[in-house]
């Protein structure tokens, strides 16, 4: 089990969730129930005859489900998990020269990097593959458990297992964790921020998402509502700048600057950009 820094859930409301499962997966469902309960989530186990697309369509409320591929988040006829194994083709194409994120975060120097806005962990997975030591921070107990499950599956994969020891999952509030790093003067080279809700461009127009990303984000938005509580955006930038000399912020290409702060440098791609803040 990954590290619990003690502050992961103290600002979250009480959570209750169903876990749907076929009878063959009852033991796994009970395991997830116990893990989530230890993180403040009350889980109701719901055995069903068949967990399929029809069942998901008929049960549109936000829930969890368990099958041979582990733990999933489901709603509105869709299901989603971080699924790190699906990222293998992308990783095999990646290199320090080809990836813009590698240049922005100086991954060739094998930095110690805090990803303070974990999401599905795909960027951290890429950065760990390219050599970084990653501290992946997430405070929502359900999303953290989904990430933990994806890492456990990755550790059993011949390709991914080669660098899983470079990813440390931390069940913590990112703001509190950055403050802790500042107080303890721990060595971190880079803080990486990819806020979940940068939905506006420089003209305050809504930014469109690709279909697959939109599908994943729809479910994450249901789990992490955009009410200011879960949007770990603007306030993290100032905290991060106190901790490290290099803060990298990922943004949609035409999005406004995080916290309205102009970066010192930018790397521009077709769909996104990386804004750098140096101290």
Curated annotation (Swiss-Prot):
Principal location: cytoplasm
Keyword terms: Cytoplasm, Methyltransferase, rRNA processing, S-adenosyl-L-methionine, Transferase
Positions that bind S-adenosyl-L-methionine: 138-139, 194
Superkingdom of this protein's organism: Bacteria
Keyword S-adenosyl-L-methionine: yes
Subcellular location(s) per record: Cytoplasm
Top enzyme category: transferase
CDD domains tied to this protein: AdoMet_MTases
Keyword rRNA processing: yes
Catalytically driven reaction(s): guanosine(1516) in 16S rRNA + S-adenosyl-L-methionine = N(2)-methylguanosine(1516) in 16S rRNA + S-adenosyl-L-homocysteine + H(+)
Gene Ontology terms: cellular component: cytoplasm
EC number(s) recorded for this UniProt protein: 2.1.1.242
GO molecular function: rRNA (guanine-N2-)-methyltransferase activity
Gene3D superfamilies per record: Vaccinia Virus protein VP39 (3.40.50.150)
Cross-referenced PANTHER family: RIBOSOMAL RNA SMALL SUBUNIT METHYLTRANSFERASE J
Family designation: Belongs to the methyltransferase superfamily. RsmJ family.
Listed name of the protein: Ribosomal RNA small subunit methyltransferase J
């Amino acid at each position: 089990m990954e590290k619990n820094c003690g502050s992961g859930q103290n600002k979250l409301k009480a959570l209750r969730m169903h876990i749907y499962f076929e009878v063959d997966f009852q033991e796994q469902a009970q395991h997830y129930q116990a893990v989530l309960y230890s993180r403040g989530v009350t889980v109701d186990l719901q055995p069903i005859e068949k967990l399929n697309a029809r069942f998901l369509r008929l049960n549109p409320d936000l829930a969890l489900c368990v099958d041979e591929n582990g733990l999933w988040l489901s709603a509105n006829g869709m299901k989603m998990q971080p699924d790190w194994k699906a990222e293998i083709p992308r990783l095999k194409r990646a290199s320090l020269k080809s990836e813009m994120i590698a240049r922005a975060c100086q991954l060739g120097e094998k930095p110690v990097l805090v990803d303070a806005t974990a999401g599905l962990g795909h960027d951290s997975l890429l950065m760990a593959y390219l050599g970084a030591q990653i501290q992946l921070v997430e405070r929502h107990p359900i999303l953290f458990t989904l990430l933990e499950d994806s890492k456990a599956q990755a550790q059993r994969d011949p390709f991914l297992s080669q660098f899983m020891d470079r990813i440390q999952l931390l069940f913590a509030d990112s703001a509190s964790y950055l403050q802790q790093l500042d107080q303890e003067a721990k060595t971190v080279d880079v803080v990486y921020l990819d806020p979940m809700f940068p939905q506006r461009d420089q003209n305050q127009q809504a930014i469109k998402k690709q279909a697959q990303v939109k599908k994943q984000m729809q479910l994450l938005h249901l789990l992490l509502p955009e009410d200011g509580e879960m949007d770990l955006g603007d306030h993290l930038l100032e905290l991060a700048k106190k901790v490290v000399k290099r803060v990298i912020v990922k943004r949609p290409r035409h999005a406004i600057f995080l916290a309205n702060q102009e970066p010192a440098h930018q790397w521009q791609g077709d769909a996104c950009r990386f804004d750098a803040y140096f101290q």
